[in-house]
Swiss-Prot record:
GO terms for molecular function: 3'-tRNA processing endoribonuclease activity; zinc ion binding. It comes from the Bacteria. Keywords: Endonuclease, Hydrolase, Metal-binding, Nuclease, tRNA processing, Zinc. It comes from Listeria innocua serovar 6a (strain ATCC BAA-680 / CLIP 11262). It catalyses: Endonucleolytic cleavage of RNA, removing extra 3' nucleotides from tRNA precursor, generating 3' termini of tRNAs. A 3'-hydroxy group is left at the tRNA terminus and a 5'-phosphoryl group is left at the trailer molecule. HAMAP family: RNase_Z_BN. The gene is rnz. This is Ribonuclease Z. The active site is at D67 (proton acceptor). Its EC number is 3.1.26.11. Zn(2+) 2 binds at D67, H68, D211, H269. Binds 2 Zn(2+) ions. Homodimer. The lineage of its organism: Bacteria, Bacillati, Bacillota, Bacilli, Bacillales. It holds the Pfam family Lactamase_B_2. Zinc phosphodiesterase, which displays some tRNA 3'-processing endonuclease activity. Probably involved in tRNA maturation, by removing a 3'-trailer from precursor tRNA.
């Protein structure tokens, strides 16, 4: 899995940063891409990346502010032109269905695929055999969600060396043993596949937050995450301003990462007041509290678990 930051700016696009959108690429895991927020011109950023809209399976909207949703109509239309024909699900606050449907209807846009809308409340919003996604309210004046994506633990690997040492030759029997089945060999021996399977592989946890000021719900959403993606609209000494505008600072994000025992913090949603050099200072500041911090730039790619 990898995170591709398509837009990392706050409020309005700047020369250095487009507005918010993050792609979670899971091509190896489920041959799919999930998108978190879709600010204006996100589809232009997609063209500059390796992301394929035909692989887009789900879109998660954190809140209904324009810098997080104005890119949706164009991106959804372009997905049709790029061969997307599988159903797409959009999760988000109340109003997301009306916004998308109205935009498409008034523009006369006809899609080649079906959109399913899930207007969510806090709790589990999606689960299958591979992933569990939960959401909770943040604090941004309008309803804003944070998302927690949990990859379920994977079965341990089959110990082929141990099987070989026990005189079991590779072949179709390996698949049965990998499934944990009890198998009778040609020589009459009965072996249990569970004795040859290693420890389960721990799944990854990714927490992606919408815009927010400091709030208590953040801690549970972020707890023990492999990656926490958090806004850092302002530098540390502007905490009062951040609170008034319902946003966060670098230090507030770093303190949360430390308290939640996350492995990596990625800062995004950077105000246009900070150019590239000033952004480096934001990173240095956050690292004084939480060392394993990165600051996202447009088109930056981060591997999950590294």
């Amino acid at each position: 899995m990898e995170l591709v930051f398509l837009g990392t700016g706050a409020g309005v696009p700047s020369r250095g940063r487009n507005v918010t959108s993050i792609a979670l690429s899971m091509l190896n895991e489920r041959n799919a891409i999930w998108l978190f927020d879709c600010g204006e011109a996100t589809q232009h950023q997609v063209l500059r990346s390796h992301i394929k809209l035909s692989k887009l399976e789900k879109i998660f909207i954190t809140h209904m502010h324009g810098d997080h949703i104005f890119g949706l109509p164009g991106l959804l239309s372009s997905r049709s032109f790029q061969g997307g024909d599988s159903d797409l699900t959009i999760y988000g606050p109340a109003g997301i269905a009306e916004y998308v449907e109205t935009s498409l209807r008034l523009s006369g846009t006809r899609l080649t695929y079906k959109i399913n809308f899930e207007e969510i409340e806090p709790g589990v919003i999606f689960e299958d055999e591979m992933f569990l996604v939960t959401a909770d309210d943040l604090d941004h004046g309008v309803r804003s969600f944070g998302y927690r994506i949990v990859e379920k633990d994977k079965q341990g690997a089959l110990n082929a060396e141990k099987l070989k040492a026990d005189g079991v030759e590779a072949g179709p029997v390996f698949q049965k043993l990998k499934n944990g089945e009890i198998v009778t060999l040609a020589d009459g021996r009965v072996i249990d596949g569970k004795n040859y399977i290693g420890e389960p592989q721990k799944g990854k946890i990714i927490s992606i937050f919408g815009d927010t000021k400091e709030t208590v719900s953040e801690l549970e959403l972020a707890m023990n995450a492999d990656i926490l993606v958090h806004e850092a609209t302002f530098e540390g000494d502007k905490a009062k301003m951040a609170g008034e505008y319902m946003h966060s600072t670098t230090l507030q994000a770093a303190n949360l990462a430390k308290a939640a025992n996350v492995k990596k913090l990625i800062l995004t949603h950077i105000s246009s007041r900070y150019d590239r050099d000033a952004s480096k200072e934001l990173l240095i500041e956050a690292k004084t509290v939480f060392e394993n911090t990165e600051i996202a730039y447009d088109l930056a790619v981060f591997q999950v678990g590294e």
